[in-house]
Every structure is written in C-alpha cells, then in structure tokens.
C-alpha cells in the first residue's frame, strides 16, 4: 500500500466551516460528542492541557499531530481507559463520565485499537457477542441466534465473512472489519479508529473506506487517527490538530492542503520535506547478481554505489523485505552471487553481515527491533556490546559516552538513557534503533519502512539523517510503502512484483505512474 506525504483536497462536502485558530466549529449542527477544557497529567508530564474537541453526527473527524501530541491520551479518556483530571465530556448534549471502557461502550463510544483485541481461537460470532451471548429458553447459549444476528450485521456492513470462521484464520484487514462490526453491534454512535490502515493493502484500505462512508451515512461520528495525509483528504470531513498536549485548531479537510496541515502539526513551516541531494559518484560497493530464494523471489540483480540511496518499491507481498533479510543473512539465498567491496561473499547469518559492514533496521520495530522492557541505552548498545567487553568486564563509561553522542547526533528525545524505551514516542524509538546500527559503523544501511508509524516532524529528521549518511559515503537501501518517500529520497528506484524484479528507474525518470505500473506486474517498454 502506498501512502502520501502530501495530497490534494477532496471535493467539497456539505459541512459547516471550522475554525483555523483554535476556536470551535460553527454550531449549525448538533454535536454528538463534545470535549471541553479537558486536562490530564502523569508524573512529570502534562499530557493534555485544557483541550477541546467536537464531533458531528454523520462525519469523519481526522485527528492529527506528532507523536506525543496528546491524541492517544484524549482518545483513552473518551473511551473510559483514563479519567481526566479536569474538564467535561458531553455525549448527545448530556454530561457523562466513564470509569471503565465498558461504561463508555455501553453509552455508545467504541474504540478500535491499532493492536486488535480479538480471540483468535473463537469464531467471528463468538468474538462479537462475547459477554453478551444470546440465551435460549433453557438459559443456554443460542448459537443459531448468534449466527443469525452476526450474519445480518455483517451483511448490513457489506462484510463478506462467515460468522463461524475462526478469527485466527483471518487477515489483519478482515479482523479490523470484525472489530468494526463488534463496535456497531453495541449501537455505538461514536467510533474511534486508531491507525486502521497501518498494516493492510491498498485494496483493503478501499474496502475499509467504503464501510466508513456507510457508517457516516448512518449518522455515526467517526474519529480517525492517522499519520497519512492522503487518507485525511480522502476520507475526512474535518481535521483537528493537537500539538504538545494542546488543541491547535480544527479545519474543514477540503479547505486545507498538505503544507498547511504540516504547519499546524509541527508549529513551523517545513519548506522542504525531502532534502536536496546530488547524484553520488562513488564506486560500486555492493553487487547482487541473480539472487534467488525458492518460492519467495528470483533473479534479483542490482549494483549499489557508496553514497547512493537505492529505493525498493512494491506492493505488500512483492518480496522487498525478503530481499533485505537475505542480504542480512536472516534467510540465506538459494542461488545467486553477492559481491561486497569487490569480493564475493556468502552471508550465512546476521553476525557475518554485521562483521562485513551491513546493518538492517527491520520493518516492525515493536516485533523485531525493540526490547520494550529495557532502557534506551540497553536497546542502543545491543549490536556493539561485545566490542566493549573483555576479561569479564564492560567498559561502561566508554559505552555510555558513545550512546550519549548518538542521542545528540540523532536528536533522540528522552529524559535519560535509563528511561524505558517503551515510553518514548514512535519517532524517538525509531531513532534509538537507528542509533544502535550506526554505532556499528556500517557501510551498507538497509532501512525497511523507516518512517512507518511516526509523525511528520520525525519523518523529516529521518530523511535528513539518511541524506547526511549518504553524503558521508554510506550506501543506503530504503524499502518503503510510501511512494512519495521513495521518489523523494532515492537516487534510483527498484520495483518488485510477486518476487520478481520488474525494473530499476533512475531518479530523473521515476514517477508515481511508472512505479505503480511496474508494481502491478507490467513491464515498462
């Protein structure tokens, strides 16, 4: 799935105008949900400071802001997970307070989390009605009635799934549909969706958006949290922006463009999202010839020069990540040749790859990158700890000094190196993981979805860092599902489709149309 850093506004929708300077939208329609002067603090941190938010019935409100802006905290307050320190919540015009998520759900507010909360070994029907099972005259669970109600619910939402299918057999997108059906089954008037498209394909996104449009037509109020601006302009009626725990303002989506939205989010104008770079003139550092992994990808060939950024584009399942993992020795190739620094090499495991000068920032930092219960320093030192150990001792002072230097260079925002890394924002977690690999002094840096799930301000910092590393002679392979990112950062773009390399485009000839044409399985003639 390809996202976008900037996008064109959609056609105008019939909505009252919003404000652009922190006020409230015009009261031409009754509000479904109103948040007034809400504040929330944690030890040493003010997460929300006197914020407001209003949701109209039959509308999609996109909620945007950098990581740490307070979006998630406010949503957890609305959903009954946290209780506010001050302020008021009004639902359908009446003051409400929620002690638990169940009380919010019963009142008509449902939150669909980014990490889905379903039971994999239970059926769709059982997941939807868990805790609310229909009973027959004998006070036993009436499975037939549950099946009938689930089938009706899925049909109404145009979700083509069997109520008896086990949730564990469903794709991520299908599980999201089940979560939506479950929320609707509570007759929820307000649905909160947190990054719902972060791990689904372009086709699945289109299906999700059609369901959201149906819910909007039914009068539901939808709060849609996302970092992807193209989604905002495609699906949202209004956009609310938070920054540093404060409400910045609300605008109609069709009155904004990408630049004005970025300015609201970061508090400054980002005149250039992607830094300017000159085409490198370094020597070939890595040469890959007909690299293959049986059943996954075949005959992948390319050269990578020192100081070059090679982008790899393709739809999900195209084999991009598999190529990266093979180069790093996670899944050794079945055939083909890899030449590094002029010599043929056989990379059998990641340890060999690191010794040669390879580094890999993996696709899913939470699953394969972070040690969430460890500190920032413990996460950063993982790849170089052996270099500072000897005779049963670790050179803690020197190791700490290097970690501090990397934090300064990469602008990792953390109260201390002892801070648990799981408490940092997504952007700072990603920079800490990048610091881990830069401490190994790699010659080839492989970045798999380096800006996934981080805000636009952190993205700009990552882009500038990549450009700086390339200018210093590091060779970079960057895999990304965001097409503007690939085109904006790469000197050349390699495009893959179902395990096959479809072509390599030079920066001067690469366009969204050409890349999508190749990614869809069509050769450029």
From Swiss-Prot:
Record-annotated ABC transporter domain positions: 33-269, 279-523
Principal location listed in the UniProt entry: membrane
Function: Part of an ABC transporter complex involved in carbohydrate import. Could be involved in ribose, galactose and/or methyl galactoside import. Responsible for energy coupling to the transport system.
Region (Disordered): 1-23
Gene Ontology, cellular component aspect: plasma membrane
SMART domains according to UniProt: AAA
Cited InterPro entries: AAA+_ATPase, ABC_carbohydrate_import_ATPase, ABC_transporter-like_ATP-bd, ABC_transporter-like_CS, P-loop_NTPase
Protein name: Putative ribose/galactose/methyl galactoside import ATP-binding protein
Similarity comment: Belongs to the ABC transporter superfamily. Carbohydrate importer 2 (CUT2) (TC 3.A.1.2) family.
A single MF term (Gene Ontology): ABC-type D-ribose transporter activity
Compositionally biased tracts (Polar residues): 1-15
Keywords linked to the UniProt accession: ATP-binding, Cell inner membrane, Cell membrane, Membrane, Nucleotide-binding, Repeat, Sugar transport, Translocase, Transport
Chain residues that bind ATP: 65-72
Subcellular location: Cell inner membrane
Membrane topology: Peripheral membrane protein
Catalytic activity: D-ribose(out) + ATP + H2O = D-ribose(in) + ADP + phosphate + H(+); D-galactose(out) + ATP + H2O = D-galactose(in) + ADP + phosphate + H(+)
Leading EC class: translocase
Transmembrane segments: none
UniProt-listed Enzyme Commission number(s): 7.5.2.11, 7.5.2.7
Species annotation: Pseudomonas syringae pv. syringae (strain B728a)
């Amino acid at each position: 799935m390809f996202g976008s850093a900037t996008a064109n506004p959609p056609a105008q929708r019939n909505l009252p105008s919003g404000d652009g300077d922190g006020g409230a939208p015009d009261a031409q329609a009754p509000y479904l949900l109103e948040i007034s002067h809400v504040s929330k603090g944690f030890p040493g941190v003010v997460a929300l400071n006197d914020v407001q938010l209003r949701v109209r019935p039959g509308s999609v409100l996109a909620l945007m802001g950098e990581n740490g802006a307070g979006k998630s905290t406010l949503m957890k307050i609305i959903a009954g997970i946290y209780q506010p320190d001050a302020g008021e919540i009004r639902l359908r015009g009446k003051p409400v307070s929620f002690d638990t998520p169940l009380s919010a759900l019963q009142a008509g507010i449902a939150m669909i989390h980014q990490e889905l909360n379903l039971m994999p070994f239970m059926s769709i029907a059982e997941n939807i009605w868990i805790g609310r099972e229909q009973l027959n005259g004998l006070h036993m669970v009436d499975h037939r009635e549950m099946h009938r109600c689930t089938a009706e619910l899925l049909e109404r939402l145009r979700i083509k799934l069997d109520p008896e299918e086990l949730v564990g057999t469903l794709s991520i997108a299908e599980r999201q549909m089940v979560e939506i059906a479950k929320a609707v089954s509570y007759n929820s008037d307000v649905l909160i969706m947190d990054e719902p498209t972060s791990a689904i394909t372009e086709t699945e996104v289109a299906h999700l958006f059609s369901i959201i449009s149906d819910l909007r037509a039914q009068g539901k109020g939808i709060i849609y949290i996302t970092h992807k601006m193209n989604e905002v302009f495609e699906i949202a009626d209004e956009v609310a922006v938070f920054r540093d725990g404060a409400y910045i303002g609300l605008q109609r989506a069709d009155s904004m463009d990408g630049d004005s939205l970025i300015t609201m989010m970061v508090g400054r104008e980002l005149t250039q999202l992607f830094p300017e770079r000159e085409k490198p003139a370094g020597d070939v550092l890595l040469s890959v010839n007909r690299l293959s992994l049986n059943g996954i990808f075949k005959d992948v060939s390319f050269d990578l020069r020192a100081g070059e950024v090679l982008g790899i584009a393709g739809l999900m399942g195209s084999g991009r990540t598999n190529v990266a993992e093979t180069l790093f020795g996670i899944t050794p190739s079945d055939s083909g040749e890899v030449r590094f620094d002029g010599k043929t090499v056989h990379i059998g495991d990641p340890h060999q790859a690191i010794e040669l000068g390879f580094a890999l920032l993996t696709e899913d930092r939470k699953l394969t990158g972070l040690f969430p219960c460890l500190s920032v320093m413990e996460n950063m030192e993982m790849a170089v700890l052996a270099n500072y150990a000897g005779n049963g001792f670790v050179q803690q002072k020197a190791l700490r000094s290097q970690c501090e230097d990397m934090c300064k260079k990469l602008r990792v925002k953390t109260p201390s190196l002892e801070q648990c890394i799981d408490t940092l924002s997504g952007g700072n977690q990603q920079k800490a993981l990048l610091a881990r690999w830069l401490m190994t002094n790699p010659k080839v840096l492989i970045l798999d979805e380096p800006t996934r799930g981080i805000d636009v301000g952190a993205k700009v910092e990552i882009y500038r860092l990549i450009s700086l590393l390339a200018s210093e002679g590091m060779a970079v392979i960057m895999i990304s599902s965001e097409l503007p990112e690939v085109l904006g950062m790469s000197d050349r773009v390699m495009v893959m489709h179902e395990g096959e390399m479809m072509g390599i485009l030079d920066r001067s000839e690469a366009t969204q149309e050409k890349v999508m044409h190749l990614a869809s399985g069509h050769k450029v003639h």
